[in-house]
Each structure stands twice: as C-alpha cells, then as structure tokens.
C-alpha cells in the first residue's frame, strides 16, 4: 500500500481547505467576508505567539509592537515606494522578521520575566517612538489602501471578498509553512530549548541562535498579521496597536492551547465573535456605558479561566485525545 508522507498530507489538507474557503467566499455576505478576514489575521497573530512561547519557551508581552513594525513597513512600502499591496505584505513580514532577529539576539540571554518585561517595555514605548518620526505620520498615522480588486475577477467581486482572499491565502500559506517547520529538526530543537535549555546545549544546540531564529520567525508572522490588520482598517497609527492587543492575543493563544497549532483557528474565532456576542447581549438586556465597555473583557477573562480549567492544552489536543480513547 502506497504511504503518503505527513508533509504531503498537510499540503493536501491545506489545498482542500483553501478550495472550501474559495467556495464559501462566494456564498457569504460582505460582513462575514470582513469578519473572516479578521479571523485569518488573528490566526496568524496567535500562531506567532504559539511559536515563540509554546514551542521555544520565550514569553512575549509585546507582540502588538511586532505587528506594528510590519504594519508600518507595509504602509511605507505602498506610500513611499509604490509597491504592489501584496508585495507590501511580504515586505511587512520580512522587515518585522529582521527586527525580530535583532531583538532576539539582543534578548538571547534573557528569559522568563526579564524577556517578558523587555517586550512589554517595547509595546509601551511604541506610541512615543512612532510620534518622533514624521515619516511614520505621528498620531494620525499612515493610510494603507490596497486598491480595487483585479478587473479579471469580475464586477461582482467586492472589496470585502478581496480582503477575505488575501487574508485567508496569507494565513493558509504561513500556517502550512509553520506546521512543516515545527515537525522538522527546527521544531524539535525549539522544543528541546523550551523543555531543558541546559540539556539542549549539551546536545550541541546553539541556544542563542535558536532563540533568535524563533523570535525572528515569530516576529515575521506577527508583522504579516499587522500588515493584514491595517489593510482591513485602511491605515496604521499607534492607537491601532495598544498594549491591550498583546494581552488579547495571549488570551487567544491560551484558549487555543500554547503547545499546539491544532486549534489556532478556534482562538481566532473567539476573538472575532466575542465583541459581536457582547453587543448582542447589551442590545437585549441593556446596561450602562461602563457595562457595555467592560463586557467583552469580562467574557474573554471568563473564557480564559474555563480554558485553563477544562482544556489546558487547547481544544485541538482535547479532541485528539478523545478520538484516541474511542479507538
């Protein structure tokens, strides 16, 4: 019997998923297309945290800053260098990846709360840094317009469907790449680094290099998600990447399960669905302005507690374990 390698199985699976998304995009409204694009963006952002924290054991509290690096890189690529928006998204990932590589080497000797504090300081200082350089647009930020969809896609092909295609294609390609990477030698070295750095070093693994590599890859994926975010909101400014975004992404990673990519889309769906659910609850039962503002945060916090109590390794691991118990 012909055996298919795990890499080919993943490729076939992602191709089928891409085909399903392509079919779905013609059958859903513009609102769902827009929300689907946000799900794809959050999927990438959460995956970048899972790579850094869950696989290499490095805790970042400032991933919103890495997203901002990619966002500004993408906007500058379009506005100043007149690059095609899709090329600008690639530049967003590359420049954020280089920034992450430099940061990774600088923080290679840091771990635990020291590394978390460093990334937190970066996220806190982002608005001040952005406001110091006129080329970044100050508080007003920069516009980011990807233009109209290609004419060959037809007159009925909307801007929101174009957003959906770009975001989902980016997420599928990057998650496929990441899944293959984490099942390769690099993934094994990342896990060794996470579980026991001393033993990993004795086994011949270059700790500093692998930490920097993980940071660079994570930053590149976060930068791409930042580029997708500013594409969806048509501009980039410091206010688009608050510190609260970093904590929201961490919550999404915990709901997903930080040690696996299997349920990453679940965490992304949760982050997109909660504001809509909260709005629906408020419209039904009413409430003060403070209640309306705090309800989404309360719902995320409650879900976070439930996830830690009942699915600490994520829903993907839970379903996988349940499937094996049946057999």
Give residue ranges: language-model regions:
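Transmembrane alpha-helices and adjacent helix-loop boundaries
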Residues: 1-327
């Amino acid at each position: 019997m012909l055996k298919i390698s795990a890499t080919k199985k993943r490729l076939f699976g992602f191709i089928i998923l891409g085909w399903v998304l392509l079919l779905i995009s013609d059958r859903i409204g513009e609102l769902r297309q827009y929300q689907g694009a946000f799900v794809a963006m959050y999927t990438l952002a959460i995956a970048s945290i899972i790579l850094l924290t869950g696989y290499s054991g490095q805790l970042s509290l400032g991933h919103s800053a890495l997203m901002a690096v990619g966002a500004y890189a993408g906007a500058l690529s379009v506005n100043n260098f007149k690059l095609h928006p899709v090329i600008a998204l690639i530049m967003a990932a590359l420049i954020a990846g280089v920034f992450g590589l430099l940061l990774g080497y600088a923080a290679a000797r840091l771990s635990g709360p020291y590394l978390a504090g460093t990334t937190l300081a970066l996220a806190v200082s982002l608005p001040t840094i952005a406001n110091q350089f006129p080329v970044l647009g100050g508080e007003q930020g920069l516009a980011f317009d990807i233009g109209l969809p290609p004419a060959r896609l037809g007159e009925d092909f909307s801007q929101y469907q174009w957003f959906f295609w770009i975001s989902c294609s980016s997420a599928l390609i990057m998650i496929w790449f990441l899944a293959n990477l984490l099942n390769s030698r690099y993934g094994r070295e990342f896990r060794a680094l996470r579980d026991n750095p001393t033993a990993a070093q004795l086994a011949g693994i270059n700790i500093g290099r692998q930490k920097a590599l993980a940071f660079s890859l994570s930053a590149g994926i976060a930068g791409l998600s930042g580029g997708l975010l500013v594409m969806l909101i048509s501009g980039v400014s410091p206010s688009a990447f608050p510190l609260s975004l970093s904590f929201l992404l961490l919550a999404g990673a915990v709901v997903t399960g930080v040690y696996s990519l299997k349920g990453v889309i679940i965490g992304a769906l949760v982050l997109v669905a909660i504001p809509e659910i909260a709005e629906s609850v408020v419209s039904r039962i009413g409430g003060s302005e403070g209640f309306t503002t705090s309800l989404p945060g309360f719902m995320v916090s409650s879900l976070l507690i439930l996830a830690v109590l009942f699915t600490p390794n994520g829903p993907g691991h839970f379903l996988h374990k349940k499937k094996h118990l049946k057999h």
